[in-house]
């Protein structure tokens, strides 16, 4: 019987995959790739709606998953970062959200199971990727009306629940609520996860990953990491971590803070350094690995991956780094 992610994370540092968007860019896809024949009737541009590729170019998404698994990833994320009715409304494809999530999970699940069967001693897991959406519950998009909100907590929670029910039915091993910039959005997602698990009768670990927006270590909605932890302590959280924001070196002080205070497993998936003036990431896989090595040697993490600018070449540096390394021990696990 395959071990669960909860069992394996206590034994060794797990490797999460890298960026999906960065990998998709390498395929130089055109509008017709995103649209396909099926969505010919949809108005507006669909190029850039990466999640839709699970339906129109599943071969590309599966190829990316395979590259990350070949690189040594223990956990691959579904291509569902924006697969909610809230986010898909901009593309006029919100009615396909359930199907998109089911398709995305199947693409990842089939490959994860294939690689687990090849080497049962290194089981592979699927994390359902849940992004923050393009709306915020706690801030106004209208500078002239601070009280205005683009959507309500209930609307967002319902949208998340629909996504998560499909993920759970599809067979994810965990739900990863990531790139959190608004704690109220995250709380809606946590509530939705709890409701989705009740509705489906399937329980999986809930992982959180926060994005700090400045060198002061606050989220976009203004919370410190300590305040964020206090805001979610009521929930049954498996892991908490940091992603995006900065490169590994710049992210380290915030990771140290999180590792010292959070009673959960700790994750980190930094960007490939900081973007240059053209928005590109210049840091090499070897350079990033050199910075990440400090996380591992200092016992800061349980799960390590990559965010913006990273590819399978970056993730391929990790297996040698984590081999034999001791995972982080939080206060609750000591």
Task: Give residue spans per PLM region.
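Domain-level signal for soluble alpha/beta catalytic cores
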Residues: 1-332
